[in-house]
């Protein structure tokens, strides 16, 4: 029984329980905030929402927060 206790102690020292992700550490899904981050033609008049493309006079490709939003020119 003491061997099992030693093994358990070694395992807990090498891999503590705090290393496991807890529910409080995970991000919460917030669909309302995602909708605010969405690119819309109201915010960007050169953006054509149907084609996901930029209109004339826009520089391409266009990125928003390191995400490609317009690739056709």
Curated annotation (Swiss-Prot):
Q: Which UniProt keywords apply?
A: Cleavage on pair of basic residues, Disulfide bond, Neurotoxin, Secreted, Signal, Toxin
Q: Name one GO molecular function term.
A: ion channel inhibitor activity
- Which is a Gene Ontology cellular component entry for this protein? extracellular region
Where is it expressed, tissue-wise? Expressed by the venom duct.
Name the Pfam families on file.
Conotoxin
Main localization, broad class: secreted
Q: Which residues form the propeptide?
A: 20-49
Q: Which domain of life is it from?
A: Eukaryota
Where is this protein localized, as stated in its record? Secreted
Explain the purpose of this protein.
Shows a paralytic effect in fish.
Q: Further notes on this entry?
A: Found in injectable (milked) (IV) venom.
Q: What is this protein called?
A: Conotoxin CnIIIE
